[in-house]
């Protein structure tokens, strides 16, 4: 997955909203968590270099940070019928470990 920092995206960023029958998450590179000074809850997950921010409070932090940088966000949707594999990933218990 070729992802760039928003500052290199000329003011636009496309993100994927992963949803299943019960919840949803916005996928971002884990480097964005530190770069945007996000503080995800234990309702968010990570797998390799991707963080899956839960769609309620954690994703709102992301959108607010990007808005403050004047970065336009486009969302692509990925719906899974049943449980998403994201639920099997590690939960964020401490941002320092990302």
Residue ranges, per PLM feature:
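N-terminal, charge-rich interaction modules
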Residues: 1-12
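Generic preference for well-ordered secondary structure
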Residues: 10, 46-47, 73
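Cysteine-centric segments in proteins
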Residues: 14-16
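A short, structured beta-strand/loop element
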Residues: 20-47
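Short, compact, well-ordered microdomains
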Residues: 52-98
């Amino acid at each position: 997955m070729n992802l760039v920092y928003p500052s290199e995206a000329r003011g636009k960023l496309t993100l994927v909203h992963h949803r299943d029958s019960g919840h949803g998450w916005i996928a971002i590179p884990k480097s964005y968590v530190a770069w945007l000074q996000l503080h995800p809850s234990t309702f968010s997950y990570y797998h390799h270099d991707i963080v899956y921010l839960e769609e309620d409070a954690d994703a709102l932090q992301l959108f607010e940070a990007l808005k403050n940088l004047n970065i336009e966000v486009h969302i692509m949707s990925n719906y899974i019928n049943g449980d998403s594999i994201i639920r099997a990933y590690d939960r964020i218990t401490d941002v320092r470990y990302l």
